[in-house]
Amino acid sequence: MIVTDAWFPQTNGVVRTLAQTSEWLGRFGHEVRMLTPRDFRSIACPTYPEIRLSLLPRKLVEKSIEDFSPQALHIATEGPLGLAARRYCLRRRLRFTTSYHTQFPQYLRARFPIPIAFSYWALHRFHGAAVRCMVSTQSLRNELQARGFRNLAAWRRGVDTDLFKPGPKSYLSLPRPIAAYVGRVAVEKNVEAFLRMPWEGSKLVIGDGPERARLQALYPTATFTGYRYAEELAAHLAAADVMVFPSLTDTFGLVNLEAMACGVPVAAFPVNGPIDVIQDGVTGALDHDLGKAARRALTLDPKACRENAVRCGWDASAREFEGNLVACQSNQSSRGAWAMDAGQGAAAGVGS
């Protein structure tokens, strides 16, 4: 069972990661139950309407877990569903795993005057109860270990290279070179750094969010498309000349892999996430000057971007996730990697 507060119709890397993982686990022969806001009464998040917050989910979460009786339970998010599932597991002495997808301390700080230290304390308390907390990159792992997290395991991300692949540049008729941003248009994504950077050509914003109206009014020369999905998203991305990733707070940045799979180099700041995904001078350019990084990325070989991305399949990502799972009961008979107890964690990449 995978419990997540992030699910469709949200459009982000967390949802895409969990959807792909669930699909591949099914291909491996597992019966997967996703517990999502679609199963509950919910309200729109006041600051982000597309995010649904489940209302008073405790009893239904408990019933869902009892009815499904999972061999392994993974809590993917720290929202109402994740909190309810964690509470149930602790009360029933069930073992579980979690994953760290979002830098909530930085996200919250960008919106509200909440001390970062307090947010990390809350996250440490949440994830510390799990047998393993899965993280996507080594730099994130190092950062969390420095903040006292001790139960960390590696869970790399993947990309659908059949969907995201090189395509015709003629798909977009904007003046060249085209620099594209793909993702939520929100304050924590630092989109304005992309829109402010000097650029001779076109800027394309593929996505939507609470900051779109303000930024579209401030930067009328940029093209805002709103959300694009699946083949249409891949076609837009493949037609760009460079993808710019301005975020300073992402734990990974799945769109970086998607751009590389399309043969499009990525420009980003040298921060956690990009430094783990982008090979500077090969698949993209890292620089504290975002415009300089974007201009340098234009000189890179698209074939090298594609070649690096095809090594990152979702099948390998799902296998790594599977290997990190633990049996809910310490004496439970379980198959394959789920039989592994916490003492064998080094084999699954658990930090010390």
Predicted segments with their positions:
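Conserved donor-binding/catalytic core segment of Leloir-type glycosyltransferases
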Residues: 168-204
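Nucleotide-sugar donor phosphate/pyrophosphate-binding loop at the beta->alpha transition
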Residues: 95-97, 106-125
